[in-house]
Amino acid sequence: PIWWARLAATPLLGHIFCALIIPNLGPLISRANIDQNFLPGAAPDHYYEQSAVGLAFRPGAFRASAQDVCALSAELAAQAPNYPEILAPAIIITAEKDRVLSPKRHARALAAALPAAELVIAPDCGHMPHQLRPDLALAAIRRVNAMAGVSAQS
């Protein structure tokens, strides 16, 4: 995990960091972090305000998120052997240029493990393909519904 997650998840020092530093520093650097998530594209207009990013900098919320980040790799490794048991149709959308999560390690591996999965790669998108290419997300929802025999009227 990245340094801030390890620090925030630390028992005593993490509480201090989350209570004193994050509420003040987080909002100052979050816009740049959001922009990084959308690269090579740009964040939609008003994304910061409309997505309520500021709520993530509440001490308890930030610490819980950091603990999740620290546990993620181990949790995914524990779940992965069960992926072939998931028989429901799935469409996995990943971004070609995601700098946050490795498309190869996450989306491609999951698609390969699920028996009824389809992988959709959003070209020239960063970590937020559902924001930049909502057409892909909507098409995926429609395809999964069709695969599952659910009508558009349901």
List each model region and its residues.
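Short alpha-helix in the alpha/beta-hydrolase fold that links the catalytic acid
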Residues: 79-80, 88, 103-112
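Conserved alpha/beta-hydrolase catalytic His-Asp/Glu region
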Residues: 3, 22-85
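Short beta-strand segments
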Residues: 34, 66, 93-94, 121
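Flexible "cap/lid" loop of the alpha/beta hydrolase fold
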Residues: 1-19
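Residue-level signal for the nucleotide or nucleotide-sugar donor/cofactor binding architecture
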Residues: 60, 101, 105, 132
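Catalytic active-site module of serine/aspartate enzymes centered on a nucleophile-bearing elbow/loop
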Residues: 115-154
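Short beta-strand/loop motif that positions the catalytic acidic residue
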Residues: 86, 92-94, 98
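Acidic catalytic loop of the alpha/beta-hydrolase fold
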Residues: 71-73, 96-101, 127
